[in-house]
Design a protein with these regions (language model features):
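Residue-level marker of regulatory loop/turn positions in helix-turn-helix DNA-binding domains and
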Residues: 83, 102, 133
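Short, surface-exposed connector motifs at secondary-structure boundaries
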Residues: 92-98, 151-152
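Asp-based, Mg2+/Mn2+-dependent phosphohydrolase catalytic module
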Residues: 1-6, 106-211
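N-terminal helical cap/lid subdomain that shapes the substrate entry/recognition surface
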Residues: 2-95, 106-107, 119-120
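Residue-level detector of anion-binding/catalytic polar loops
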Residues: 37, 98-100, 174
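Hydrophobic residues in well-ordered beta-strands that form the structural core
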Residues: 18, 101-103, 177
Length: 211
């Protein structure tokens, strides 16, 4: 199956990089410090900015300090961070197809995790610091499309989480979901779904999928 597109906009954590062990370990330590149920905190965490996640559980006057604490815990190491299947190969074979990263991580987290996973950063990267609102708001994907000079409707967004899928659709893009972190039924809003990026190959006019 061929998905024609003028540009590809990649989510990072859960799509290209697996940092689950680090994120869960940090979240559980943080939740214990702040008296929050760690399972509740993690339940809707994936694909969202840290500050937005924290704001769901703490009053506004504590969000900045608590966000900084969680960021610090997540920056304590890179153990267990790996590239997800097919990610390195797909990026190496983009063959001039314009692409960008749009992530809910801040720049420091992005560089730490992609570096540990061996994922090279493209020239255009949109992080949590670059947008007024995080996913599911479409701001990040709209910014990335603008920087690439491509109409959002001509972009293919690749995501692994419901919040990111909602952001891609709200931007007007076609959304491809990978089944790396969520069950298929929770990603039903995506236009297309594949197991992982090992089933995707780049071509000058878009991406080829092996379903």
């Amino acid at each position: 199956m061929i998905l024609p597109c003028a540009a590809v906009l990649f989510d990072v954590d859960g799509t290209l990089v697996d940092s689950t062990p680090l994120v869960e370990r940090a979240a559980r330590e943080w939740a214990a410090e702040y008296g929050i149920d760690p399972d509740e905190f993690l339940a809707d965490a994936h694909g969202r900015r840290t500050s937005d996640r924290v704001a769901d559980f703490l009053p506004p006057d504590r969000v900045r300090e608590a966000t900084a604490r969680l960021d610090a815990l997540e920056a304590t190491g890179t153990d267990g961070i790996t590239a997800l299947p097919g990610a390195v190969e797909l990026l190496a074979g983009m063959n001039g197809l314009p692409h960008a990263f749009v992530t809910s991580m801040d720049r420091a987290q992005l560089e730490l995790r992609t570096g540990a996973a061996g994922i090279p950063l493209p020239p255009i990267v949109i992080t949590a610091e670059d947008v007024p609102d995080g996913k599911p708001d479409p701001s990040g994907y709209l910014q990335a499309a603008g920087h690439l000079g491509v109409d959002p409707s001509g972009c293919l967004v690749i995501e692994d989480a419901p919040a990111g899928i909602a952001a891609g659709r709200a931007a007007g893009a076609t959304v491809l979901a990978v089944l790396t972190s969520h069950p298929r039924e929770s990603l039903a809003a995506a236009h297309h779904t594949v197991e992982n990026l090992a089933r995707v190959a780049a071509a000058p006019d878009g991406l080829h999928l092996r379903l």
